[in-house]
Amino acid sequence: MKMMKPITMVAAILFCGGATTPEPPGAPADQFFSRIAALCGRSFEGRLVTADAADAAMAGQRLVMHVADCTADRIRIPFHVGADRSRTWLITRTAAGLRLKHDHRHEDGAPDALTNYGGDTAGPGAAERQEFPVDAESIALFRREGRAASVTNVWAMEANGLLFAYELRRPAGPNVRHFRVEFDLGRAVPTPPPAWGAAGR
């Protein structure tokens, strides 16, 4: 009886076993969204890893993010800086990718004059990182509120299983900026109090 060569035998086994080509992964934006949604309900402590002078006051504060609630199309993440609970990140699905907005509130829950700014992803990005260039609505808001330095903002978020990062950059020039805070996903912390104005959002 003629014996099959090892390589031929392996090929035959795979063929007879109905081996199929793996399905292609989802869009990077969808993968990224799913990574964040998997953290829903949990809170994590972070640290400032950049050294811009504008962020000096934040350097000594306790930084906590809380993936507070998630739907199929939106994730809400309050970001607490010490006792200041005014900041919330909103990640929303769009037809082309993802949108990041910043919801800023006063302690009584009223919207700050500088709120609902951000931008949409301009490309596919990666499952681990998405970037959000400033949108036209936010540029108009920044100019109206005397924050013209912010009209070139690009925000980014990263999630790689070990850490979550939030980042702000501006290109080189008189308004150059780099802010980045990283959160350790390996150690959850107790849930902080709700963000200001969280009720009804």
Kindly give the residue locations of the regions a language model identified.
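Short, surface-exposed coil-to-beta transition loops
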Residues: 60-62, 84-88, 150-152, 176-178
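Edge beta-strand at a domain terminus
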Residues: 115-120, 161-201
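An exposed acidic His-Trp-rich patch
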Residues: 89-141
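Helix-rich interaction surfaces within compact, conserved domain-sized segments
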Residues: 130-171
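Bacterial Sec-dependent signal peptides at the C-terminal "C-region" and cleavage site
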Residues: 15-26
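Tryptophan-anchored aromatic micro-motifs
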Residues: 25-54, 102
